[in-house]
């Protein structure tokens, strides 16, 4: 599988995963969509940086893949965090990074 298709596959999984947290309640869903959009913007920024770095020969494709996946999944724990505690505050809930690690281990995207 080529690198672009691999990242697109992860993006598709991410979209389906996030959709599971939508409830139909506009106020709740606005918070979920905020984090979805944020994660995709971070991925877009990472794509621009990675593209330049790979073209310049300062980043290999393995590192590029890691950077893109890190960008996409950096807030993956936020969705469970918000569903359970209705907050994105780690201080008022749980560490979203650790929660995200659990999500990725359980889901294996």
Task: Name these PLM-found stretches.
Residues 62-109:
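Divalent metal-dependent catalytic cores for phosphoryl transfer on phosphate-bearing substrates
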Residues 2, 25-27, 95:
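Alpha-helix capping and helix-coil boundary motifs
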Residues 13-44, 79-90:
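Active-site flanking loop/helix segments enriched in acidic
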Residues 12-16, 71-74:
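Membrane-targeting and insertion segments and their boundary/processing signals
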Residues 30-68, 101-109:
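Alpha-helical phosphate/pyrophosphate-handling elements in metalloenzyme active cores
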Residues 2-9, 109:
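Histidine/acidic-rich helix-loop-helix segments that form or flank divalent-metal centers
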Residues 6-10, 14, 96:
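Alpha-helical structural motif
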Residues 19, 23, 45-55, 73, ...:
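Short helix-loop boundary/capping segments at the starts of domains
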